[in-house]
Amino acid sequence: MESKSILEELLLKKSQQKKKMSPNNYKERLFVLTKTSLSYYEYDKMKRGSRKGSIEIKKIRCVEKVNLEEQTPVERQYPFQIVYKDGLLYVYASNEESRCQWLKALQKEIRGNPHLLIKYHSGFFVDGKFLCCQQSCKAAPGCTLWEAYADLHIAISDEKHRAPTFPERLLKIPRAVPVLKMDASSSGAILPQYDSYSKKSCGSQPTSNIRYIPREDCPDWWQVRKLKSEEDIACSNQLERNIASHSTSKMSWGFPESSSSEEEENLHAYDWFAGNISRSQSEQLLRQKGKEGAFMVRNSSQMGMYTVSLFSKAVNDKKGTVKHYHVHTNAENKLYLAENYCFDSIPKLIHYHQHNSAGMITRLRHPVSTKANKVPVSVALGSGIWELKREEITLLKELGNGQFGVVQLGQWKGQYDVAVKMIKEGAMSEDEFFQEAQTMMKLSHPKLVKFYGVCSKKYPIYIVTEYITNGCLLNYLKSHGKGLESCQLLEMCYDVCEGMAFLESHQFIHRDLAARNCLVDSDLSVKVSDFGMTRYVLDDQYVSSVGTKFPVKWSAPEVFHYFKYSSKSDVWAFGILMWEVFSLGKQPYDLYDNSEVVVKVSQGHRLYRPQLASDTIYQIMYSCWHELPEKRPTFQQLLSAIEPLREQDKP
């Protein structure tokens, strides 16, 4: 017996082109919606003819409007789409009222359907690709969040299946969490209580009734508070954090919904996973490797997606080609690069394509790692200066000379690579030394070089910091600059600006910002280093004592005239650094000595636009060189100015 009709209307239908040679035509059909199906019929002389097609309601996954194509005729001004298990149907209503009526009726019937789409395609599929995102597979995952999903998706809400605010695997503390005593309590949000093992109770009974509070001053560390007495600090790196929220499902992060937590792979364990590296940085690293099939996997700029970046070099092609492939999810929540080869996880997908190109330019042959043998956050500083044991540090080779002594590559505990700044006796006072150590200890940001500890019981004093693989930015620009594109140079400036914005927000002044004092990491991100001249000031201004050395060519007028330092003098220096980057390491004011630079700058002379800098980029660096400090932008404003220029670099 046929179900009762909910809605009937004569609508225009676009051919679904299920076959490659099918014509792209439009026909009027009588659409009939019932509780179980959406069917369409021939219609002639006010009579329903034979049925031409039907879609089961339970198979429909999305019903939504479609953006108009260019030069759309009058009769096709109100399109909507029906995405179902076996295809995609475009239908045109006669007016907006009719379209809204159909959308409302269809969405009401599909409410609670399995496999409803979180994202859909807002553009038509035309000439073998979606107009909205240029994806060429008709079954490709959507690019636009479907707003109706939240209302139509029926979540499992009974107590048996409801996800807790913080799932059980949120905080999983190993038996040997390093702990450091705290004198005073810290305020913050209180997390659920879990059993924990402190260093004292390791191997005995677990310590219960513990609260975990994220520390605002150091995001890598959480406060561990006993409900009754003492406080400890536990490193958040060793607390397995897996924040569950309604908006971020397993599927949205590239894992099938059906997979259990045991099956979810930790991608950071794989050498080929580069995390949040940018498109331009991945291209530079792959070209540096220069091997056919060099590859890495990175987070895409599209939330929850991954991209495989792959290098190939044809005969007589000196530069080579880098292709970027999105990892897609099909209707069964399987992952794929090539549609016919689907897998449950990213590692399985990569393993397959390491042996089969399957539609890619070449197979994945040589993983390019951005990982270095760094000290994990779990053993870095939490609170107070950490006096390291000198005998645990092996010096390997000299890296260079700093203001206060030699910098060496070292190995800590025979395991971790570190940089060791060796302070000569008499090079600076102990007060200066501990001021630097305390300053560095308070700074924790991805774009600042990490401070690990000190050896201060005898000379030479050691300052032990993060080892940055590719050395100083200035030398990197000189040796690799010709292979860098403008967008990659801009990314370097943005990294430095991020680090400086952090210093600015904490009222720290660097006082010696330049390309020579920034370092290039293994993933080509740039970190700000050398805080030997940094001071903490409450009024954001520090007046230097007369006779103090300072780098004239990077100094603002108020520095070389009045010895006044502020965040705005750092901004001036950042403008010079941008000039260094876009001139690939040239010396600023190379035709003048220091005394001539003072005269020229005081007269209003400024550096010229480097050839690789666009007018817009030059305007940004030029804004840093305003004679009046208050007229210069803040680092936060500089970030906002640079950000739109980076958009073109996103995949």
Curated annotation (Swiss-Prot):
It comes from Mus musculus. Residues 393-646 form the Protein kinase domain. The active site is at residue 512. Non-receptor tyrosine kinase that plays central but diverse modulatory roles in various signaling processes involved in the regulation of actin reorganization, cell migration, cell proliferation and survival, cell adhesion, and apoptosis. Participates in signal transduction stimulated by growth factor receptors, cytokine receptors, G-protein coupled receptors, antigen receptors and integrins. Induces tyrosine phosphorylation of BCAR1 in response to integrin regulation. It catalyses: L-tyrosyl-[protein] + ATP = O-phospho-L-tyrosyl-[protein] + ADP + H(+). TEK and vascular endothelial growth factor receptor 1 (FLT1) stimulate BMX tyrosine kinase activity. Activated by integrins through the mediation of PTK2/FAK1. Activated by TNF through the mediation of TNFRSF1B. It holds the Pfam family PH. One of its GO terms (cellular component) is cytosol. Belongs to the protein kinase superfamily. Tyr protein kinase family. TEC subfamily. This is Cytoplasmic tyrosine-protein kinase BMX.
